[in-house]
Amino acid sequence: MFSQITRPVRTFIDQFSNINQGIAAGERIFSIIDAQSEIQDKPGAIELDGLKDKIEFRDIHFSYDGSREVIEGISFEIKRGETVALVGPSGGGKSTLSELIPRFYDVKAGDILIDGVSVRDYTQDSLRAHMSVVAQDTVLFNDTIEGNIAMGKAGATHDEIVEAARIANADCFIQEAPEGYQTNIGDRGVKLSGGQRQRLSIARAVLKNPEIPVSYTHLRAHETEAD
C-alpha cells in the first residue's frame, strides 16, 4: 500500500521540479526576447531598395567603452561588384568595421553611406535584408543540414539548397553524412567539425544571394582541402 503511494508522489515531485526549472528558463528567455536594442530606427527611416552604386566609410571612429577608440578615422569605399578584403593583425578592428554596416553597432563619429545615404537613415530590417553575414562564430541549430542552410532564404527549394552547398564546397561532406541533407547536426552543430560548420554558414549566405555579403575571417577553421 505504502509503495503504491510513494511511487506516484516521487513522480509528482520530479515533474514539479522540472516545471519550476521550465518556468525559470522561460522567464530568462522572455527577458531576452523583450529586451529593447539600444539601436533603433529613426523616425521617418526609409527602405533600402538595393545597392546601386557604392558603400562609403567616411572618417569612421568607434569605441566600445566610450573612451579608447578601436577605429580611428578610417575612410574608404566599396563600389558595387567589388570585393574588398580587410587584412591586419588580430584585434585591429576588421570584424568591428564589418559589424558597423548592418548596424550591430553605431559609429561614434563619421558615417557609413550606402548610395550616398547614411545607414542610420535606413530601416534596420531593409538594411539587413540585403546583407548576409558569415560570422567567426557560426550559429547553427539542432536541426538537419538542409534545415540549417534553408534559414538563408524563406521557401528555398531542395535544389537551391544543394546548389548553395555545392558552391560553398559543403556538398561533398554532406553526401557522406549518414542521412545526407536530412542528417541532424546536433545542438550548435556539435556533430560537425569547425570547417564543416563554417561551410554550412557560407552555404546559407550563398543561398540568400545578397547584394552586400560580409564575411569575417572564416577560413581559419577550414580544413586544408577546403581552403
Region annotations inferred by a language model:
Residues 34, 41-42, 48-215, 219-220:
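ABC-type nucleotide-binding domain
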Residues 21, 66, 227:
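Active-site-proximal flexible loops/turns
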Residues 19, 36-39:
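Signal-transduction coiled-coil helices of two-component systems
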Residues 221-227:
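A short, hydrophobic C-terminal helix/tail in secreted or cell-surface proteins
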Residues 4-32:
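Cytosolic ends of transmembrane helices, especially the final helix of ABC transmembrane type-1 domains
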